[in-house]
Swiss-Prot record:
Function: Oxidizes aldehydes to the corresponding carboxylic acids with a preference for aromatic aldehydes. It might play a role in the detoxification of aldehydes to avoid cell damage.
UniProt: FAD binding residues: K26, F27, I28, A29, G30, G31, T32, N33, L34, T108, D164, I213, K230
EC top class, as a word: oxidoreductase
Keywords assigned by UniProt, alphabetized: 4Fe-4S, FAD, Flavoprotein, Iron, Iron-sulfur, Metal-binding, Oxidoreductase, Periplasm
GO molecular function (one): metal ion binding
Name the record gives this protein: Aldehyde oxidoreductase FAD-binding subunit PaoB
Binding residues annotated for [4Fe-4S] cluster, in chain numbering: C119, C129, C138, C157
Domain of life assignment: Bacteria
The encoding gene: paoB
Cofactor field: FAD; [4Fe-4S] cluster
GO BP terms: catabolic process; cellular detoxification of aldehyde
Domain FAD-binding PCMH-type: 1-223
EC number from the UniProt entry: 1.2.99.6
Organism for this UniProt entry: Escherichia coli (strain K12)
Length: 318
């Protein structure tokens, strides 16, 4: 780990301004991903801005009847919140499917959204990786790619986004609230938050330099059956090969989003319109642009079967 300076700030505006003022600065809250990356010198911030004291740890009901989740709400607290468990069960279940209890106690809402890929080539500084070192190449393209993306890929990167929480939040039409160094606030839908890899996979989100996430807002809850199904190599502390988040109504309508298959939570609204036609029709829409490698083609069949299993469960409990 390389040397860095450290400061604590008192307001979100102060945090954003400090991040803009100091080149190479990073925000730190739970640190569950950032500290690992710093130890490996994948992330080498010159300055850490501790945002834990900003009071962004509340869950509040909005005037519209939704929820406003502070950026610093810990994953454990969010999953256990009475309103989340009752009205946004898919989110609670996704959170509990991720990481371990110890990590959930420390990890924050904003940090979960911003966590980096777990591609082994990203973590190996001896390997080329366009996400870590732009222009160096992508070792995964011709390497071990069993866990990598099958949709939304480019010739520069085939890494997946690892978050379970983000998949559920995308299903729920979450909106990310931020503050810029100029003191302006922005609202970014989660649908627009993650950038496709294209030729610049190192630019992962829509955040501007120094911009700080302050909250995530959820619209009023949707009724129906909430399901989160995660398929992985072992029963705990493993990232998804494929995951499916779904909210299905008694009449068979609803919405679905997938994890483990792309650089972001994978949702195509046109697929929702196919739910009444069954899993095959939904799958065909979601994976029309699939571009798997020889090693991860199995994910396509796995995704189709997981979709079918989720829809069958929803029908059985309707």
């Amino acid at each position: 780990m390389k040397a860095f300076t450290y400061e604590r700030v008192n307001t979100p505006a102060e945090a954003a301004l400090s991040a803009q003022r100091v080149p190479g600065a990073k925000f730190i809250a739970g640190g569950t991903n950032l500290l690992d990356l710093m130890k490996l010198e994948i992330e080498t911030p010159t300055h850490l801005i501790d945002v834990n004291g900003l009071g962004l740890d509340k869950i509040e009901v909005t005037d519209a009847g939704g929820l406003r989740i502070g950026a610093l709400v810990r994953n454990t607290d969010l999953a256990a919140h009475e309103r989340v468990r009752r009205d946004y069960a898919v989110l609670s279940r996704a959170l509990l499917a991720g990481a371990s209890g110890q990590l959930r106690n420390q990890a924050t809402t904003a940090g979960n959204l911003l966590q980096r890929t777990r591609c082994p080539y990203f973590y190996d500084t001896n390997q080329p990786c366009n996400k870590r070192l732009p222009g160096s190449g992508c070792a995964a393209l011709e390497g071990f790619s069993r866990q990598h993306a099958v949709v939304g890929v480019s010739e520069a990167c085939i890494a997946t986004h690892p978050s379970d929480m983000a998949v559920a939040m995308r299903l729920l039409d979450a909106v990310v609230e931020t503050i810029t160094p100029e003191g302006k606030t922005r609202s970014i839908t989660l649908a627009d938050f993650y950038h496709p890899p294209g030729k610049t996979p190192h630019i992962e989100t829509a955040l501007l330099p120094g911009e700080l996430i302050v909250a995530v807002t959820l619209p009023p809850p949707l009724g129906g059956k909430h399901i989160y199904r995660k398929v992985r190599d072992r029963a705990s502390y493993a990232f998804a090969l494929v995951s499916v988040a779904a909210i299905i109504q008694p009449d068979g309508s609803g919405r679905v989003a997938l994890g483990g298959v792309a650089h972001k939570p994978w949702r195509i609204e046109a697929a929702d319109a196919q739910l009444s036609q069954g899993a095959q029709a939904v799958y065909d829409t979601l994976f029309a642009s699939a571009h798997p490698t020889a090693e991860n083609t199995f994910k396509l069949l796995l995704a189709k079967r997981t979709l079918a299993s989720v829809l069958a469960e929803a029908r059985a409990q309707a």
